[in-house]
Curated annotation (Swiss-Prot):
The gene is atpD. HAMAP family: ATP_synth_beta_bact. This is ATP synthase subunit beta. GO terms for molecular function: ATP binding; ATP hydrolysis activity; proton-transporting ATP synthase activity, rotational mechanism. Transmembrane segments: none annotated. Belongs to the ATPase alpha/beta chains family. It comes from Geobacillus sp. (strain WCH70). F-type ATPases have 2 components, CF(1) - the catalytic core - and CF(0) - the membrane proton channel. CF(1) has five subunits: alpha(3), beta(3), gamma(1), delta(1), epsilon(1). CF(0) has three main subunits: a(1), b(2) and c(9-12). The alpha and beta chains form an alternating ring which encloses part of the gamma chain. CF(1) is attached to CF(0) by a central stalk formed by the gamma and epsilon chains, while a peripheral stalk is formed by the delta and b chains.
Length: 473
């Protein structure tokens, strides 16, 4: 163990000088352990990660926890290896911090548990799997218009408060209940309250036994928020590579990963690039995203919530993330204001899996017809606002009539929101979703009032709701 001393503390960035010309490798973990000698001092147990070499014997590091109480001259020990976190069965049902330490008060992880470093190379080119398979989510708007790919990367885009986290919670619920798969949840720079709620909900629903959770929340220093996504990814990689599982990796929120990088970038002495972001933005994102993939042994399907600053999709952070994604689910504030939940924009959401050779001809044609109908309705809205419905041709009136039913039928109740709405959630298989929309497009339900289509699951529930409203079906 080689020792050094703290020579400078700049918020979350700490400079350390080592003896005898020793220089720890980039990404090595350094430890500072200090017992308080009087009441004015605090106990310190801090991990630093080497980020830069300054000269022959000095390194600049990023702290993984608060640097409160740190003083120049304190002793630092080089561990000789990167941060390593526990992997395997011991992680299931547990909650960890960025260093892989349990924070759920359920006891320590056994000393003999396997630990893997959080910095690892992406799988080799020849190890990657190429076949495309659809992952059924049970959420109609997703399955019909922007289906998710097994082993793909999916982005949930949206501004503040439009429902990204609720959608992620529903996906965790549906995939655990219907597919029995293992999930890893990485909470990156989001609200601690939401993480706590999610943990308790998953405990109550029994999903927690199939899930590992890692948190580096809003109140933590940028070092923890930068690395917590890698901690979660390392746990997911073990299940993929060693156990051949299809794993789900949820990251909420990938924007905070970029944001944390930009917070320390200037302190590390880098010149800022566009909009003040770090110049290494694309590289950092690429290193994370390239490890999330399908291999010959198993797959990691990643669902990432992406906060869009001020609803500006051209901002470098969301724009850089876009290039890595197979499918995008865009959440739209206008739809949330109309009471359509999930507030997914059916025209802006995309997926490379929406192709006849992947989803089948019928599904593809129904999805395209739904999008055409909604697009035409959007074009007609200005005319309706100025001249009213009466000025439309009969054909356009019919399009508006059906588009409104489609728009409402794209909404549904969520299992995870039952306690707020008082309505049971619904899981709709893809086959049922395609059949329901096909029948609406054919005009089979033109006589049913549009309110009957709001927040229901299968098309049969629409008919049932209409009967309760006293409509002849």
């Amino acid at each position: 163990m080689t020792k050094g001393r703290v020579i400078q503390v700049m918020g979350p960035v700490v400079d350390v000088k080592f003896e005898n010309g020793h220089l720890p490798a980039i990404y090595n973990a350094l430890k500072i352990q200090h017992k308080a000698r009087n009441e004015n001092e605090v106990d310190i147990d801090l991990t630093l990660e080497v980020a830069l070499h300054l000269g022959d014997d000095t390194v600049r590091t990023i702290a993984m926890a608060s640097t409160d109480g740190l003083i120049r001259g304190m002793e630092v020990i080089d561990t000789g290896a990167p941060i390593s976190v526990p992997v395997g069965e011991v992680t299931l049902g547990r909650v960890f911090n960025v260093l892989g330490e349990p924070i759920d008060m359920q006891g320590e992880i056994p000393d003999d548990a396997r630990r893997d470093p959080i910095h690892r190379p992406a799988p080799k080119f020849e190890e990657l799997a190429t076949e495309v398979e659809i992952l059924e989510t049970g959420i109609k708007v997703v399955d019909l218009l922007a289906p998710y790919i097994k082993g793909g990367k999916i982005g949930l885009f949206g501004g503040a408060g439009v429902g990204k986290t609720v959608l992620i919670q529903e996906l965790i619920h549906n995939i655990a209940q219907e597919h029995g798969g293992i999930s890893v949840f990485a909470g990156v720079g989001e609200r601690t309250r939401e993480g706590n709620d999610l943990y308790h909900e998953m405990k109550d629903s029994g999903v927690i036994s199939k899930t590992a959770m890692v948190f580096g929340q809003m109140n933590e220093p940028p070092g923890a928020r930068m690395r917590v996504a890698l901690t979660g990814l390392t746990m997911a990689e073990y299940f993929r590579d060693e156990q051949g599982q299809d794993v789900l990796l949820f990251i909420d929120n990938i924007f905070r990963f970029t944001q944390a990088g930009s917070e320390v970038s200037a302190l590390l002495g880098r010149m800022p690039s566009a909009v003040g972001y770090q110049p290494t933005l694309a590289t950092e994102m690429g290193q994370l995203q390239e490890r999330i993939t399908s291999t010959a042994t198993g797959s990691i399907t990643s669902i990432q919530a992406i906060y869009v600053p001020a609803d500006d999709y051209t901002d470098p952070a969301p724009a850089t993330t876009f290039s890595h994604l197979d499918a995008t689910t865009n959440l739209e504030r206008k739809l949330a204001e109309m009471g359509i939940y999930p507030a997914v924009d059916p025209l802006a959401s995309t997926s490379r899996a929406l192709a006849p050779e992947i989803v089948g001809e019928e599904h593809y044609q129904v999805a395209r017809k739904v999008q055409q109908t909604l697009q035409r309705y959007r074009e007609l809205q200005d005319i309706i606002a100025i001249l009213g419905m009466d000025e439309l041709s009969d054909e356009d009136k019919l399009i508006v009539h059906r588009a409104r039913r489609i728009q409402f039928f794209l909404s549904q109740n969520f299992h995870v929101a039952e306690q707020f709405t008082g309505q049971p959630g619904s899981y709709v298989p893809i086959k049922e979703t395609v059949r329901g929309f096909k029948e609406i497009l054919e005009g089979k339900y033109d006589h049913i009032p549009e309110d009957a289509f709001r927040l229901v699951g299968r098309i049969e529930e629409v008919v049932e709701k209409a009967k309760q409203m006293g409509v002849e079906v």
